[in-house]
Amino acid sequence: MQFNPIIIGVAGGSASGKTSVAQAILQRVGADRIAHIDHDRYYKDLSHLPLEERARFNFDHPDALDNDLLVAHLDALCAGQAVDLPTYDYATYVRLPYTERIEPRPVILVEGILIFYEPVLRRRMHIKLFVDTDADLRFIRRLRRDIAERGRSVESVIEQYLATVRPMHLEFVEPTKRYADVIFPGGGRNPIAIDMVVARIEAALQSMA
């Protein structure tokens, strides 16, 4: 059975404010009507590598993500089937044995830095949003987040930013801005843009009713 949900993509650089935009949409549209998927859950398992090598892995390259699994999950949700989202441990760089089940909803909201890079993902999205934030602000946010939430040291965050995060953003993330239907300037704190997106979602949902 085809469920035909509306698929929304929220992209942007690391720590750009994607989650803030996603949460604003969830609050306005209603979490009971949205299946929320974070692309970060789909990082490939690195348990076969020594810990030091895992720490040097390029997580900002498209090949770091299991997009085949994400596509399979999107297609399953569109077919009215529940899916089990993977859980990733950012401290040890491995996929954990437990999952989180989500049920089909009228709206699927996917967020991640690279969700517009892969054509196979882009083609499935009805509304594409890009959160555009200054690089210095993104770095400060990332530094605070990785220290507080992921147990990282200041030195390791800076090293990773210079080695992979910044160059991969310029090569793979920034160019995908051209695919966006709406660009959120200033880190996503744009209530007018949120109003426009929510109105578009509500209109689409009414047309499906």
From Swiss-Prot:
<keyword id="KW-0418">Kinase</keyword>
<dbReference type="InterPro" id="IPR027417">
    <property type="entry name" value="P-loop_NTPase"/>
</dbReference>
<keyword id="KW-0547">Nucleotide-binding</keyword>
<dbReference type="GO" id="GO:0043771">
    <property type="term" value="F:cytidine kinase activity"/>
</dbReference>
<keyword id="KW-0963">Cytoplasm</keyword>
<comment type="pathway">
    <text>Pyrimidine metabolism; UMP biosynthesis via salvage pathway; UMP from uridine: step 1/1.</text>
</comment>
<dbReference type="GO" id="GO:0044206">
    <property type="term" value="P:UMP salvage"/>
</dbReference>
<dbReference type="InterPro" id="IPR006083">
    <property type="entry name" value="PRK/URK"/>
</dbReference>
<dbReference type="GO" id="GO:0044211">
    <property type="term" value="P:CTP salvage"/>
</dbReference>
<dbReference type="GO" id="GO:0005737">
    <property type="term" value="C:cytoplasm"/>
</dbReference>
<dbReference type="InterPro" id="IPR000764">
    <property type="entry name" value="Uridine_kinase-like"/>
</dbReference>
<dbReference type="InterPro" id="IPR026008">
    <property type="entry name" value="Uridine_kinase"/>
</dbReference>
<dbReference type="GO" id="GO:0004849">
    <property type="term" value="F:uridine kinase activity"/>
</dbReference>
<dbReference type="GO" id="GO:0005524">
    <property type="term" value="F:ATP binding"/>
</dbReference>
<protein>
    <recommendedName>
        <fullName>Uridine kinase</fullName>
        <ecNumber>2.7.1.48</ecNumber>
    </recommendedName>
</protein>
<dbReference type="Pfam" id="PF00485">
    <property type="entry name" value="PRK"/>
</dbReference>
<keyword id="KW-0067">ATP-binding</keyword>
<comment type="similarity">
    <text>Belongs to the uridine kinase family.</text>
</comment>
<feature type="binding site">
    <location>
        <begin position="12"/>
        <end position="19"/>
    </location>
    <ligand>
        <name>ATP</name>
    </ligand>
</feature>
<keyword id="KW-0808">Transferase</keyword>
<comment type="pathway">
    <text>Pyrimidine metabolism; CTP biosynthesis via salvage pathway; CTP from cytidine: step 1/3.</text>
</comment>
